[in-house]
Amino acid sequence: MKRAFVILGIVLCSLSLAMLQGQEKHEFGSYKEMREYLGKLFSQKKYDEAASLLESVLDKFPDNVLANTYNLALARLFAGDSEKAIRALEEGHRRGVFYGLWDFAAKLWDPVKSSTRFEAFLKENQARVEEAQKRASMKIEVATPAEYDPAKKYPLFIALHGGGESVADFKPSWTSPRLRGEFITVYVQSSQVASMRGFHWQDVAVTRRDLEAAYKRILEQFPVDTGRAVIGGFSSGGFGSLVAAIKNFLPVRGFVVLCPEVPTTIGDEDILAAKARRLRGTLLTTEADNRVEQQRTLMGRMEKLGLPADFHLTPDIGHWYPKDFEALLDRALGFILEAGKSE
């Protein structure tokens, strides 16, 4: 009997060792490897295990504290522990980060929204956003066309990033053969803070100030054909592009926007004035974008009032770039610049 207990103890020790060894296999050589494994845990709804993993790597990946504490809070929330979810966000603050303006807008955060502790967290987070706003400024990056010759004049494309993005995030996606080959493209980064690494265009007065300053700087430094300027952008950048083009913040020939938030301040008189200036535009969107109906309504108003505008909807995709975006962008440039020559 004693021997049986000894054997059982050895077996249990062996099992425990095997379990520990199994856990030790999850040593990650990079943040990417960890995120891939974390994604599997979330997809399998192993939220407690995901939370334990995230807690264990907070010190290992100090450059990713923002994402890791946010995902830790999500894991705790999905596991049904609201207090630990808030504690994870407070840990992010303790480690020096703050969260984005829209990070807690989704309904999944409803379980914590009535908590006084969460309200205190949000107040502190807003204070950090406001402090970051004091240091923020508009920035630009310029891409000149292939075989650029400063003695020639080139069409200009003013490109505006999406909400919560930076130029670094946006620039690789917003490009096309015509932009690379023919245009001076200025990527403008808003001064309006959305998150630690991202910005937005929702304040119309600030958007106007930023864009007018960027446009002035470009004209001073580059040979722009001011009669062939186009503005465009994604999501919040689409919002900024629409108000800038239709309300005549900048003297552009047209706009190209992808999945934009639709400005509510654009009146029929603005559209008629834009028509008189011979403005043209293209609105690209996707079937699962949550603003499709507002986008359709705006385009319907433009059509009714006689402003030439093209509408294109890509099926089976959400709020993001369609696979043929570059071709769609070049087609839109043709619609604005070439078709407008005969008017």
Kindly label every feature range from the protein language model.
Residues 26-77:
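Alpha-helical adaptor scaffolds
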Residues 327-343:
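Catalytic active-site module of serine/aspartate enzymes centered on a nucleophile-bearing elbow/loop
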Residues 23-26, 31-44, 87, 94-154, ...:
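A domain-start/cap signature at the N-terminus of enzymes
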Residues 261-330:
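The feature captures the conserved acid-bearing segment of alpha/beta-hydrolase catalytic domains
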Residues 156-224:
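Serine-hydrolase catalytic machinery in alpha/beta-hydrolase-like enzymes
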Residues 154, 158-160, 258, 314:
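Alpha/beta-hydrolase
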Residues 227-276:
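Primarily recognizes the serine-hydrolase "nucleophile elbow" in alpha/beta-hydrolase
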